[in-house]
Amino acid sequence: MTTTPDITPALVEALRDAARRNEAFDRLTAAMLRPLYWHIRRLVVVHEDAQDACQECFVKAYDGLEAFRGGADELRAWLYRIATRAALTLLRRRRRSLFASLDEVGRELAVRVADEAGPDADRALVRLHEAVLELPLKQRLVFNLRYFDDLPYAAIARILGQREQTLKVNYHYAVEKLKTKLASHE
């Protein structure tokens, strides 16, 4: 699991100051690029798509900085929300071009996981990623944010705009489906 780098109140304050915004945004980008890239990548799978969505995320974040009024925790949640929307927008565009549902796109992406993993990849990890891509979209989002990004339910609730209890139920169902799916591959 990865941990999300700390975003300090001093960094948030620097982002609000027009004279220091560019330098502060560079620091924010350096701190959050990797976790946001991997959050997006787990949703869209393809490296180039993840790069595009990540770039879009940071452009939208920079453009929206003047309107942002929260603190450090809210900034992290806001960035994840922008990243999630960028990934979902990309998946919807792909869906329109394929005339498929998001779940069908997920199944298509599961096939790509093995292709992109390469010959040296840990087979158990590849199977886990394939199984995660077969989850319904909401469960996939919650599982990725909780398991891979190691975010607390309170942060996930801010990112997805859902109640914590709802997220816990979605995570539980996701884990149960993954256990069943992975056990059938043994």
Please place each PLM-identified region on the residue numbering.
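Amphipathic, Lys/Arg- and hydrophobic-enriched alpha-helical face
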Residues: 29-47, 63-64, 132, 177, ...
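N-terminal module of bacterial RNA polymerase sigma factors
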Residues: 1-35
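Short, charged helix-capping/linker segments at alpha-helix termini
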Residues: 17-27, 37-56, 70, 186
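Internal acidic/polar
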Residues: 2-10, 97-121
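A short pre-motif secondary-structure segment
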Residues: 142-146
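DNA-recognition helix of helix-turn-helix
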Residues: 84, 88, 139, 153-154, ...
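Structural recognition of an alpha-helix C-terminal capping motif at a helix-to-coil junction
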Residues: 52-59, 73-85
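Arg/Lys-rich amphipathic alpha helix in sigma70-family domain 2
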Residues: 67, 81-102, 121
